[in-house]
Amino acid sequence: MKNLNICIDIDGTITDAYYWLNLSNKYFNTNISKEQVTEYSIPNVLGVEESVYAEFYENHKFQIHLEQELLPNARKLINKLSIYNNIYFVTARDKSLTMLTHGYLKKNEIAYDDLYVLGSPDKVETANQLNCDIFIEDSYDNALQLSNAGYKVLLIDTNYNRLPLNDNITRVYNWKEIYKIINKLLLQYEAM
């Protein structure tokens, strides 16, 4: 029997948070640096209309998501966690990216029990269905929503999520720290 139900976002959580920046800069003829990405809304960061970015994204989403780089230690530590825990990837990605996302995880040899491509940023209902014990996320709004619903959230630090946290959210800086926190939680769970 596996112990914890771990829900993990993908973009900016297991992958580099600024994965979209190079292609976006080239397409929109901008020169935005990672340090300038201080909010979650990509169109706002780029200074373009939502509809203009949506058209760009629709035409380039497969390329954008296929080329994402994993964060250091993400693969190794998720695979270690998967031995004794359920790993559920829960992403707001467009549903048209479901097969690509399965392929990406397989290509990168990341172990998981299931993938939920929601097409929406609302993850609370899925966390409820999965009986989530801990959620790993990069979006500040998602972290607040999940934590306000009673979930423990590990928020991966980025330039765009450095806002005040509540008691259910812990800011983390890398996958080694995430692994350590989950192992501590696992020990507490086993002691009960």
Question: Can you say where each PLM-predicted feature lies in the sequence?
Answer:
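Short, acidic loop-to-helix structural element flanking the phosphoryl-transfer center
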Residues: F62-F89, D94-H102
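Hydrophobic/aromatic beta-strand patches that form the interior of the parallel beta-sheet core
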Residues: Y88, Y116, I134-I136, L154, ...
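Metal-dependent phosphoesterase signature
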Residues: Y40-K76
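Asp-based, Mg2+/Mn2+-dependent phosphohydrolase catalytic module
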Residues: N128-Q129, Y140-M192
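Active-site neighborhood of HAD-like aspartate-dependent phosphohydrolases
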Residues: M1-A54
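Substrate-recognition "cap/lid" segment bordering the active-site pocket of phosphatases
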Residues: D94-Q145, A149
